[in-house]
Amino acid sequence: MGTEFNGLFDEWAHTYDSFVQGEDIQYKEVFAHYEDILEDVVNKSFGNVLEFGVGTGNLTNKLLLAGRTVYGIEPSREMRMIAKEKLPKEFSITEGDFLSFEVPTSIDTIVSTYAFHHLTDDEKNVAIAKYSQLLNKGGKIVFADTIFADQDAYDKTVEAAKQRGFHQLANDLQTEYYTRIPVMQTIFENNGFHVTFTRLNHFVWVMEATKQ
């Protein structure tokens, strides 16, 4: 993942919070139970947390309130500006992405929500391999994102979006890199993790991977 999505992120920054509140009918199901999803990620995290894709700071705020020490990474300048308005003044957000970032001294948990699909499956593998080197035994990766149980589930979801006239959603599903559970399970296991997948709405699953 380079900077190819930065323009999209900057454009989306000022409307993102309305999306997650379900104001766009096409994405309402994608963000169903949004607060519960964030809380689940927080509850599965511990210690020093590295967060990729801070966005407008919604997950970050919950992590801080839960007493986590958070290192935030966000590629979009506009997103960083909005997040800084919502978060404590002393909290800093570093420019970077899943593959290119400043490594904090000690990390226990790596988290992200609604962002890992910006990487191809090959890039996902590179990223997880990198994180495996950063985490000690017992360290965790907790990612919430749109993924699919298998190809059939993906195909049916795309077709349903088209049938409902949700053409923007269908295009999104077909142009970004939404992966399948077997792919992610293989990636995690090949890099020394035990992983579980928990579905929290039709689109979003929480991946909880523990370093062995």
Swiss-Prot record:
S-adenosyl-L-methionine binds at G53, E74, D97. The keyword Transferase applies. It is an enzyme of class 2 (transferase). Its EC number is 2.1.1.-. The keyword Cell membrane does not apply. GO terms for molecular function: S-adenosylmethionine-dependent methyltransferase activity. SUPFAM superfamilies: S-adenosyl-L-methionine-dependent methyltransferases (SSF53335). InterPro entries: Methyltransf_25, SAM-dependent_MTases_sf, Uncharacterised_MeTfrase_YrrT. Keywords: Methyltransferase, S-adenosyl-L-methionine, Transferase. One of its GO terms (biological process) is methylation. Could be a S-adenosyl-L-methionine-dependent methyltransferase. Belongs to the methyltransferase superfamily. YrrT family. This is Uncharacterized methyltransferase BT9727_4108.
